[in-house]
UniProtKB/Swiss-Prot annotation:
Pfam families, per database record: SET
Descriptive protein name: Protein SET DOMAIN GROUP 41
GO BP terms: methylation
CDD domains: SET_SMYD (cd20071)
GO molecular function: methyltransferase activity
Domain SET span(s) in chain numbering: 115-249
Organism for this UniProt entry: Arabidopsis thaliana
Keywords, in A-Z order: Methyltransferase, S-adenosyl-L-methionine, Transferase
Disulfide links within the chain: none
Keyword Hydrolase: no
Length: 558
């Protein structure tokens, strides 16, 4: 099944009004903090347990269901609750069950043929049949409901990117296929936020999917009216007859990992243009890119290498990933985590090729390096909170530097693949916020509300500016590059790995500019300027993807 555009669709167009879910459920960890119906934050004293209002409490009958049996693993309780809601809240069409349920593909035959999950589906179906007091002779319908959820449900994120739970939408959305280079994305709004509240001036709403109505035979909004609403938005220009696509997974992965992810979650292999490209697309080549350096040009302290390049790269990847996992599991402290990861990023690993010693380092855009930057920015920020007063500023500074470098890397990837806009927006926003927090630590008497101006970017925020996104981003990045000329060496001081890069948007390993002495006031002003440009660029990308803007950038008088 697929959905195609009936006519040309411009970039930054919402493809249809918000869709209500057929069924949804919070993850267990958010049941006590968010409304189980609309996913909004609960008030301090909610009128009803687990719900923000009496109206929301009437929409959900199964939150207090019996204890889930352990046999349902790896199926999550949220999957079971969503399946229960699906069977309870809709007039279920069983005519093509178990292969389809309410026009949704279930993948029942594939999932039940997989011994790693079929037993869990069977136990979960029996559990659901008991809860709803089914008197049917078999649990085929319950199995179909679970399979429909596993195949079609999407993870619901709040405005900060936090995964709150899952939701299942009708075929108006579920028939939109996956691509690793999609032309659209989707976002969520809750019932407390009207569609017009999140609709910005430059956003259009399309009714250009008549083909969708003809194929689906369903209303665009045939959900139950409750739960997080979904909006699909174009992030590229879409030609008439072109298929509408979104991404089901994290796109900042090389082809092999994406294929594995899609198969484990959705039981299909992607054959989109990016996956089928031979040779691999540029973004996939650098997501697995390594640099081979002559041994004499490297420093001491390498890890034991091997005689096989792929094996050596695998060792680097595994070592960094193990350090990240140990840090996230609290098995190592932030300081140890930083030392372990940075030693591999900076020194690389030795290996022999044709009896000659060489050194391998991960490309700055390598997917493992991206995860490392995220972890290092977090670890250094924690160290800034836990450290003695004398090094708080240093830890905050390096945390901001890693976040800014990650933003620069994401821009490089975004230039090659426009569907990376979602990730890039998040990274630039995080960098801007960390730099914004850093500024007052550099000079306490200088207010962050100081008059920070950039005349070059002054017109980018005006409502009558219709310049192309490429032109706007080019101007912002030009300013970032200029400001970094005098700020990058200060931000990266004491961090050997980042010190070797020319700037956060230039990954050349040769530094041409020596560190320039600046007063604390100059440093603070430049950090604020850098922060404002990061937030401005994040707003540009967020508007592209979601039609929304942050309020942080308004603090600066650009």
């Amino acid at each position: 099944m697929e959905i195609r555009a009936a006519e040309d669709i411009e970039i930054r167009t919402d493809l249809f009004p918000p869709l209500s879910p057929l069924a949804s459920s919070l993850y267990d960890s958010f049941l006590s903090s968010h409304c189980s119906s609309c996913f909004s934050l609960l008030p301090p004293s909610p009128p009803q347990p687990l719900y923000c209002s009496a109206a929301c409490s009437l929409t959900d009958s199964f939150t207090n269901s019996p204890q889930f049996p352990p046999e349902i693993t790896p199926i999550l309780p949220s999957d079971i609750r969503t399946s229960l809601h699906l069977l309870n809240s809709t007039a279920v069409d069983t005519s093509s069950s178990p292969h389809r349920l309410n026009n949704l593909l279930t993948n029942h035959h594939l999932l039940m043929a997989d011994p790693s999950i079929s037993v869990a589906i069977h136990h979960a179906a029996n559990f659901i049949a008991t809860v709803i007091r089914s008197n049917r002779k078999n649990t085929e319908l319950e199995e179909a409901a679970i399979c429909a959820v596993l195949t079609n449900a999407v993870e619901v994120h709040d405005s900060n990117g936090l995964a709150l739970g899952i939701a299942l939408y009708n075929s108006s959305f579920s028939w939109i296929n996956h691509s690793c280079s999609p032309n659209s994305c989707y976002r969520f709004v809750n019932n407390r936020t009207s569609y017009h509240d999140v609709h910005v001036t430059n956003t259009e709403t399309s009714s250009n999917l008549e083909l969708q109505e003809q194929v689906c035979g369903t209303s665009l909004n045939s959900g139950n009216g409750n739960g997080p609403k979904l909006i699909v938005r174009s992030i590229k220009r879409i030609k008439s007859g072109e298929e509408i696509t979104v991404s089901y997974i994290d796109l900042l992965q090389p082809t092999g990992l994406r294929q594995s992810d899609l198969w484990s979650k959705y039981r299909f292999m992607c054959n989109c243009g990016r996956c089928a490209a031979s040779p691999p697309a540029y973004v996939d080549s650098i997501l697995e890119g390594v640099l081979t350096l002559e041994s004499e040009k490297t420093t001491v302290g390498h890890f034991d290498g091997s005689t096989n390049k792929d094996e050596a790269v695998g060792k680097m990847n595994d070592y960094i990933q193990e350090a990240i996992d140990d840090f996230l599991s609290d098995n190592i402290d932030p300081k140890t985590c930083c030392e372990m990861i940075e030693s591999v990023l900076h020194h690389g690993i030795q290996f022999k090729e044709d009896s000659q010693p060489h050194c391998l380092r991960l490309h700055a855009c390598h997917y493992v390096a991206l995860n490392a930057y995220i972890t290092l920015a977090t670890a250094y920020r924690i160290r800034s909170i836990d450290s003695e007063t004398g090094i708080v500023c240093d830890m905050s500074r390096i945390s901001a530097a890693y976040s800014l470098f990650l933003a620069g890397v994401s821009h490089h990837l975004f230039c090659a693949e426009r569907s990376f806009a979602i990730s890039a927006a998040k990274f630039w926003k995080n960098a801007g916020e960390l730099l914004f927090d850093l500024a007052p630590k550099l000079l306490m008497e200088l207010s962050v509300e100081s008059d920070v101006k950039c005349t070059k970017c002054l017109m980018l925020e005006t409502s009558n500016s219709h310049r192309d996104i490429k032109e706007k981003s080019r101007q912002i990045l030009s300013c970032v590059r200029d400001i970094s000329q005098v700020t990058w060496s200060f931000l990266t001081r004491g961090c050997p790995y980042l010190e070797k890069f020319r700037s956060p948007v230039d990954f050349s390993l040769t530094r041409t500019n020596g560190e320039r002495e600046e007063s604390s006031k100059d440093q603070t002003v430049n950090v604020l300027l850098l922060s404002s440009h990061c937030l401005l660029y994040a707003d540009l990308l967020t508007d592209l993807c979601y039609g929304q803007k942050s309020h942080l950038v308004s603090r600066f008088r650009l």
